[in-house]
Design a protein with these regions (language model features):
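Short cytoplasmic-facing helical segments at TM-TM junctions of multi-pass membrane proteins
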Residues: 105-147
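Cytoplasmic-entry segments and transmembrane alpha-helices of multi-pass inner-membrane transporters
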Residues: 44-79, 104-111, 119
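Periplasmic/extracellular loop-to-transmembrane helix junction in inner-membrane transport proteins
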Residues: 1-36, 57
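Hydrophobic alpha-helical elements at and bordering transmembrane segments
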Residues: 20, 24, 28, 59, ...
Length: 172
């Protein structure tokens, strides 16, 4: 077993090499890409679920349950089987794991919009798209940002695991 000072020296030597910065940049690229894609999908599904009751049932009763109950290691194994060892594998695993966190917050954000304020916006502007952009989205934005922040932290944890299984570069 190496002494603590030897471990610190080795850590310092790794930290100052160009290769470690390349691995950090690769992991950051994967996490950022997965987070952007998951946020777009989550916001789109949340908007879809608020427009139609059938979509609400499908998204909340089926999609969220499947995504939440499937283990992280299962997504990693499926990613390697489907995409072999590549960047797509890692990004896929991250997306599948962080979508539920982002989606739940987005759905709750749109649910918290006061119906009276929304009706007032519709009666004054008579344009549902404008009402959505001026009332619904700004009022749901704190929830959306919270979901993205939670997903960002989880994405880094998952990136390490996914890179161990499905990538030859990155921090994992």
């Amino acid at each position: 077993l190496p002494e603590p000072l030897e471990v610190l020296r080795a850590l310092f030597q790794l930290a100052v090499t160009l290769e470690s910065f390349q691995h950090i940049a690769i992991s950051m690229f994967r996490v950022t890409g997965a987070l952007i894609f998951a946020a777009i999908v989550s916001i789109s599904l949340a908007i879809l679920s608020r427009t139609n009751y059938v979509f609400t049932v499908i998204i909340e009763s089926n999609i969220l349950i499947v995504l939440n109950s499937f283990p992280s290691i299962g997504w990693a194994i499926l990613g390697v089987i489907w995409f072999s060892i590549s960047d797509i594998t890692v990004i896929f695993v991250e997306i599948m794991i962080i979508i539920p966190f982002c989606l739940i917050n987005c759905i709750q954000g749109f649910r918290q919009v006061d119906k009276e304020i929304k009706e007032m916006g519709i009666s004054f502007s008579r344009n549902r798209v404008l009402t959505f952009l001026k009332i619904d989205l700004p009022l749901a934005l704190p929830f959306i940002i919270a979901g993205i922040r939670i997903s960002y932290g989880i994405a880094w944890k998952i990136a390490i695991i996914a890179e161990l299984f499905g990538a030859s570069s990155g921090l994992g």
